[in-house]
């Protein structure tokens, strides 16, 4: 069976770690791929370098680059895997653009949605796991783990609080697609709950 499952959350929420560990557990019983945005394919990785490691840029340029990376990633990796009846686990997708560029940057969620609707051509996730933490907890984790910080990581706390507000608005408008997980807990508990949510969804 095929399923498109995305992982969302603010910086420091543990998305990458949770996705990796959940994918290892699921791989025992399912055919799947784990991937990420921006990136996932060579062209997308090049765009990732520009938007995350480069200098500050116009906010609409930023939004369009994320959408371009998303389109290439879909065409080259996600859609072929779904057509092969695989489960796709993706670290970030359209909701990141809506929360970051649409809400926190102030472009407008609907405006960024229109741009991304063109890019994704109707391919929305079947399920989105949202790892819920506060901006302060996320920042403290990044500093504690001494993680390399990209351009978005370095935004001030007010920006990251807006990102979370954006996510909450998106979840409120489309609750049927989201499963919200308290990511302030021990990582093992977060992984186990996320794994159970996905297992129940796939049954």
UniProtKB/Swiss-Prot annotation:
Domain of life the protein comes from: Bacteria
Any single biological process term in GO: dTDP biosynthetic process
InterPro entries assigned: P-loop_NTPase, Thymidylate_kin-like_dom, Thymidylate_kin_CS, Thymidylate_kinase
GO MF terms, alphabetically ordered: ATP binding; dTMP kinase activity
GO CC, one annotated term: cytosol
EC number, as in UniProt: 2.7.4.9
Cited Pfam families: Thymidylate_kin
Binding positions (ATP): 9-16
Keyword terms: ATP-binding, Kinase, Nucleotide biosynthesis, Nucleotide-binding, Transferase
Reactions listed under catalytic activity: dTMP + ATP = dTDP + ADP
Signal sequence region: none
Stored PANTHER family: THYMIDYLATE KINASE, UMP-CMP KINASE 2, MITOCHONDRIAL
Protein purpose: Phosphorylation of dTMP to form dTDP in both de novo and salvage pathways of dTTP synthesis.
Family of the protein in this entry: Belongs to the thymidylate kinase family.
UniProt protein name: Thymidylate kinase
Encoding gene, per UniProt annotation: tmk
């Amino acid at each position: 069976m095929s399923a498109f499952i995305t992982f969302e959350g603010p910086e420091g929420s543990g998305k990458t770690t949770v996705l990796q560990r959940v994918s290892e557990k699921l791989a025992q019983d399912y055919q799947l791929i784990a991937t990420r945005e921006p990136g996932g394919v060579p062209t997308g990785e090049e765009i990732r370098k520009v938007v995350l490691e480069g200098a500050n840029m116009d906010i609409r340029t930023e939004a369009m680059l994320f959408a371009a990376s998303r389109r290439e990633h879909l065409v080259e990796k996600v859609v072929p895997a779904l057509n092969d009846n695989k489960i796709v686990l993706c670290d970030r997708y359209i909701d990141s653009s809506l929360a970051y560029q649409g809400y926190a940057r102030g472009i407008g969620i609907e405006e960024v949605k229109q741009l991304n609707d063109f890019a994704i051509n109707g391919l929305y996730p079947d399920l989105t796991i949202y790892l819920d933490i506060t901006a302060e907890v996320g920042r403290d984790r990044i500093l504690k783990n001494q993680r390399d910080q990209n351009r978005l990581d370095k935004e001030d706390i007010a920006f990251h609080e807006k990102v979370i507000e954006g996510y909450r608005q998106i979840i409120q408008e489309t609750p049927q697609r989201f499963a919200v997980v308290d990511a302030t807990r021990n990582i093992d508990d977060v992984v186990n709950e996320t794994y159970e949510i996905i297992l129940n969804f796939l049954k």
